[in-house]
């Protein structure tokens, strides 16, 4: 299935004589002139690209190198991103096995326990993105995974509400870098056309690992040896696995394409040239405050932030309360865990469907932001509308599973920041804003579920319905805006997809750390 992605990659072998002349002039100005343009280039990858910018790479070379990259980094990123989700979901399993009773917390206190994680996440998000901008993304991913493991061990010592609040807050701080780090990391290794498939692959790891660890939690829930509570065993297993994974990645997760030891010198050049074509650069540590001002003025920032906020209100509520909502269908606590397994199939399965179509069709991103929300809205409408009726129990359960279709849009929402925004400072700032919206939405979500509404949580479901509708409108609005902007740029500056010299100019502007507004040859994907 990966091989067929080459239908997307365009060969750069043929250029017109005029285009070639323009290319030579550009390269000459970088290498043999007064080095004025070279001094403007901030990207760390330029060292390996110097002298090779105008050299074409064949689709066969690109495919061969991409395969090696896939096998090396995708399994590790999928595992770490899946563990990131399971760490949060573990709280809902722990509640099923009497966490609330054992440490004496009530329903409203549990809402605060769910939300406090995202207060830590919120406070740490901007510093986390600054650190990602300055340091090796791969090492940051390894370190935060190790820290998760230590903090999950800390859950075993929790004796009361205050202790749980403290450990969940610190866990939120430690997880703040992971989403932005994964976005940046994939952007450092893959072309724009390849990124959505990879995002969907590793994001599906959340659903996949959720299914696996739901079964693990089911088994651990039957352990009653007296040394630990059942819910403590869940945190113990996850802690050990997080530390093992973080340690392994420290040695085997590569940094940048230009520094990858598992590639030959020529393959490192190919890997770097592939990503340079994104016109976003690869790695720049220079911080430019002017780009922050531009991000604040950019309408795309507000589309992305609002979409993330409204999509995370359902996520924040359902991640922590889904087992409680499902138990209102009159299942036992063990049945609830098993019946909840298809909940993840509806997200992970849809991600793979979108990934499959993404191989054959370009520009599915806006559809990926809206269609999963429509499916989720239909499922929620059925659950909400049959609440007091005599509808078939399993029909309602199926509709409930449909609600998690909304999770299939999350990889697209995260990926859009890296693909619509150029300029490393602007991208870091926008990532921070989007992930702050992620945290705020997840904070708001649990408070939609009031204890007085249990077990059906009617008002919470109505709120979530409104959030799904808002996401559909915002996603469609973003698509209309970027289509209009692309047409405007093509009219004013020409189409870089039809003129190789314009495309090369755009690549060089990206290496200079120009923003998407400054780089007139940058085109938005949709």
Each model region followed by its residue ranges:
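Intracellular terminal tails of multi-pass secondary transporters
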Residues: 1-83, 107, 250-285, 371, ...
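Conserved MFS/SLC helix-loop-helix module at the cytosolic interface between two early adjacent transmembrane helices
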Residues: 122-162
């Amino acid at each position: 299935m990966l091989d067929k992605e080459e239908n997307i990659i365009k060969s750069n072998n043929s250029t017109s004589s005029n285009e070639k002349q323009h290319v030579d002039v550009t390269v000459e100005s970088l290498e043999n002139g007064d080095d004025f343009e070279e001094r403007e280039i901030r990207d760390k990858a330029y060292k390996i690209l110097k002298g090779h910018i105008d050299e074409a790479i064949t689709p066969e070379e690109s495919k061969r190198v991409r395969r090696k990259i896939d096998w090396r980094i995708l399994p590790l990123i999928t595992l770490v991103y899946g563990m990131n989700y399971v760490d949060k979901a573990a709280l809902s399993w722990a509640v099923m096995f009497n966490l609330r009773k054992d440490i004496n917390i009530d329903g409203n206190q549990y809402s605060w326990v769910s939300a406090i994680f995202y207060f830590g996440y919120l406070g740490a998000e901007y510093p986390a993105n600054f650190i990602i901008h300055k340091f090796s993304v791969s090492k940051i991913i390894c370190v935060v995974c190790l820290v998760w493991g230590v903090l999950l061990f800390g859950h075993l010592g929790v004796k009361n509400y205050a202790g749980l609040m403290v450990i969940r807050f610190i866990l939120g701080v430690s997880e703040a870098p992971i989403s932005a780090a994964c976005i940046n990391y994939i952007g450092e290794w893959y072309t724009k056309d390849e990124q959505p498939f990879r995002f969907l692959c590793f994001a599906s790891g959340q659903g996949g690992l959720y299914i696996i660890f739901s079964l693990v939690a089911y088994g651990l829930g039957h352990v009653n040896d007296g040394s630990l509570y059942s819910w403590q065993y869940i945190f113990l297993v996850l802690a050990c696995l997080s530390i093992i994974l973080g340690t392994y990645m420290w040695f085997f997760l590569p940094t940048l394409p230009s520094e990858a030891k598992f590639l030959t010198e020529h393959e490192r050049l190919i890997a770097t040239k592939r990503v340079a074509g994104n016109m976003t650069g690869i790695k720049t540590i220079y911080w430019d405050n002017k780009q922050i001002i531009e991000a604040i003025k950019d309408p795309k920032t507000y589309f992305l932030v609002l979409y993330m906020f409204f999509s995370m209100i359902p996520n924040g509520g359902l991640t922590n309360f889904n087992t409680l909502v499902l138990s209102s269908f009159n299942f036992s606590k063990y049945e609830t865990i098993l019946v909840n397994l298809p909940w993840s199939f509806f997200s992970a399965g849809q991600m793979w469907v979108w990934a499959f179509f993404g191989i054959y069709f370009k520009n599915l991103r806006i559809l990926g932001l809206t269609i999963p929300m429509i499916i989720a809205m239909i499922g929620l409408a059925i659950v909400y509308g049959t609440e007091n009726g005599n509808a078939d129990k399993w029909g309602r359960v199926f509709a409930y599973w449909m609600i998690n279709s909304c999770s299939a849009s999350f990889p697209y929402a995260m990926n859009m920041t890296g693909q619509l925004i150029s300029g490393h400072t602007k991208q870091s700032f926008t990532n921070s804003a989007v992930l702050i919206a992620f945290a705020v939405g997840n904070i708001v979500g649990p408070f939609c579920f009031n204890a007085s509404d249990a077990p059906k949580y009617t008002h919470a479901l109505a709120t979530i319905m409104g959030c799904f509708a808002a996401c559909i409108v915002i996603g469609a609005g973003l698509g209309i805006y970027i289509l209009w902007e692309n047409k405007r740029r093509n009219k004013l500056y020409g189409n870089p997809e039809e003129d190789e010299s314009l495309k090369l100019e755009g690549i060089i502007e990206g290496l200079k750390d120009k923003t998407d507004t400054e780089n007139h040859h940058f085109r938005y994907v949709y």
